[in-house]
């Protein structure tokens, strides 16, 4: 598959050539990849990178960055997803290749809005910080050179000459063996953050920065480089979106869900309608608890609320017949004529179960879909309370849910940092009296099933393991066969020419 008029080429490298492509376990991603990959690998790499960045976000708010626990858990995530992380491991070509290609694929998806760019940059910075923290000291200078950062380590003589001044100006050197610490001579303009914090020694327009502090400068350079690159990529979006081979893969990537498929559960039919009120206070996430309360009080929900809540109920086990009965009973309480419900609303419910129209069996919305699409307006109750409620209203809601003041403060801090899913996870821990829930929350139905697992010991409602599914709707059998056949046909005859992608990242 070719994106430009460049001559196609496929890398066939071995030995030293392979190592030369990726000399380090970390990089600034200055050059786009130039090889061909299949559509299947393109998609697989993209979703693996999304999983990694979401894991980085969750770990970053659950643990102090740089601590032993944070480092070990992040290393485990990177290893599990087969990305590069250590400098001196053998057979690192493939993990570094995966890292390189997947980063550039996600640029295409995450350049589309300011919020997406900000989130992407932050997670990539945290990943770079981790990798730099475990980079051997003897590799730092070559990494800086390859990244075009002209920071030279000063000689031992210069260190000795300025030892007292540097030690007095650099708090990070407290308790560090001076003899083993490298110090870098950096232009003053590149060390402004350290200067503002009075954490660096200045002389003749240069800052003398210990290795422990150089990471702050490297991260600033990386942020500026990546921010500019994303802006350039955003200019090429119309061309990317017009490509029928790329557009389907990128359209939902930024808010895709990569976990459990909650469209069909073994618990189907095990939930009775008279259980819903009780379950809503015990096991519903705030977004669904809010919708249930609004439905009971107003006997009506607008379309966005009906879709979000209806698919959630379907995912926790309501059958089509139960769903029709549930919604009809509630809407009739609101003085709706039963015939009007049967002729209009019942069709939409059957449609969501794949029984009408295109026979698309819709799956419950993931957290990312709720957070990033269809924001609520006046009179709506759908959306994510942590994302779409102002701080005071959210505080009142948490008080109503009997969250202690200290817990509310933690939740509001997470929301202020745009960590909406982690805030919901903290709510889960508070309401279920657990210190660490042991999972990363990505789906309202995941919240429900994890809650039931704790409350019932997994005896009643138990989710079954299934393959991850990323779309928010499941096509009919025939459409699935057609799509699979089409993709197989594309894979057999065409490949992604990543060399041509350079045009999207540099124009």
Curated annotation (Swiss-Prot):
Coiled-coil stretches noted in the UniProt entry, renumbered to this chain: none
Cofactor: [4Fe-4S] cluster
GO BP terms: DNA replication; DNA replication initiation; DNA replication, synthesis of primer
One of the Pfam families matching this protein, by short name: DNA_primase_lrg
Gene name per UniProt: Prim2
Recorded GO CC terms: alpha DNA polymerase:primase complex
Function statement: Regulatory subunit of the DNA primase complex and component of the DNA polymerase alpha complex (also known as the alpha DNA polymerase-primase complex) which play an essential role in the initiation of DNA synthesis. During the S phase of the cell cycle, the DNA polymerase alpha complex (composed of a catalytic subunit POLA1, an accessory subunit POLA2 and two primase subunits, the catalytic subunit PRIM1 and the regulatory subunit PRIM2) is recruited to DNA at the replicative forks via direct interactions with MCM10 and WDHD1.
Keywords: 4Fe-4S, DNA replication, DNA-binding, Iron, Iron-sulfur, Metal-binding, Phosphoprotein, Primosome
Designated name of the protein: DNA primase large subunit
Domain notes: The RNA:DNA duplex-binding domain interacts with the template phosphates at positions -2, -1, 1, and 2 positioning its bases -1, 1, and 2 for duplex formation. Interacts only with the beta- and gamma-phosphates of triphosphate moiety of initiating NTP of the primer. The side chain of His-303 mimics a RNA base that would be paired with the template nucleotide at position -1 via a hydrogen bond, thereby facilitating the stacking of the initiating NTP. The interdomain linker provides flexibility in movement relative to primosome platform composed of PRIM1, the N-terminus of PRIM2, the C-terminus of POLA1 and POLA2. Together with POLA1 interdomain linker, allows for large-scale conformational changes of primosome and coordinated autoregulation of catalytic centers of PRIM1 and POLA1. It is proposed to move the C-terminus of PRIM2 close to PRIM1 during initiation, then move it away with the 5'-end of the nascent primer during elongation.
Species lineage: Eukaryota, Metazoa, Chordata, Craniata, Vertebrata
InterPro entries (UniProt xref): DNA_primase_lsu_euk, DNA_primase_lsu_euk/arc
Residue ranges, annotated region (Disordered): 461-486
Species annotation: Rattus norvegicus
Cofactor binding note from Swiss-Prot or TrEMBL: Binds 1 [4Fe-4S] cluster.
Gene Ontology terms for molecular function: 4 iron, 4 sulfur cluster binding; DNA binding; DNA-directed RNA polymerase activity; DNA/RNA hybrid binding; metal ion binding
